[in-house]
Amino acid sequence: ARARSPEHRSGLVVLPTGTGKTEILIADLIEQYKKNNSLKVLILVPTKQLKIDTIKKVNHRFENELHVKVFIGEEKNSQILIQTYSWMSRYYQNFNSLDFDYIAVDEAHHAVAPTLQKVIQYFNPQMLLGLTATDKRLDEKSLAEIFGKYESNLTLVEAIKQDILAPIKAFRVKSNIDLSEVRFNGKDYYSTDLQKTVIAPSRDQLIVDVLKKYFVDKTMPFKSGLIFCVSVVHAKKVAKLLQDNEISCKAVSGN
């Protein structure tokens, strides 16, 4: 209600991953279309896969809950246009700044990045809504610059206590790796430094030993898992090592 008052034309939804940020957006869009079925909407997402998933979700909810045909898709003339940051950063000037009544930014912690910020500030929507689980950036840039003042109303711990999310079980494995010399650029670690430091045969073997002892013992029920590696090459090395130890594994990447 606060975001809908005349003096508030922007807002930010800050909720842990898996607690329904996209569902909140879709529910709000449905309510707005009930009031105005000619509304033009832009939803910005970071990846092609998220674009595909969001198109499916929005279409499904609109078909089931709204008795008005709305053209939803990735085409420029869509009534609800769902596109990636990169696509819109290339083509945003092909649009009029007043083309969209409502703009939503998924993974909105990226909104203060120069390229995406330029896109957002080009348009003049009646409503700008950001969705994120991580409103605190490592470079300390404030999302309030884009979305105005906001409050985080549900923490990860609270979501678990309310049975919205499953409890987290964490196991910490000590190794002799020293990360103090790995450079950090304010956003992420340098990949070259990580590869020199983290990729070590002894450490890779430790991963295998821990998995064999606690997760893939023959007396235990089958478990599946995901291992994040430093690089594609590292992923292939770890997969080969697991396979050599009779643990079913496959290396996958975005390449």
PLM regions: where:
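Pre-Walker A adenine-sensing motif
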Residues: 1-5
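Walker A/P-loop
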Residues: 7-28, 224, 228, 252
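Conserved Walker A/P-loop ATP-binding site and its immediately adjacent core
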Residues: 17-24, 37-60, 230-233
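Conserved helix/coil segment N-terminal to the catalytic DExD/H
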Residues: 72-102, 113-118
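Conserved Walker B
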Residues: 103-109, 235
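Post-DEXD/H (motif II) to motif III coupling segment of the RecA-like Helicase ATP-binding lobe
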Residues: 109-171
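Conserved interdomain linker/interface between the two RecA-like ATPase lobes of SF2 helicase motors
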Residues: 150-226
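Conserved helicase motor "Helicase C" RecA-like lobe of SF1/SF2 P-loop NTPases
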Residues: 229-253
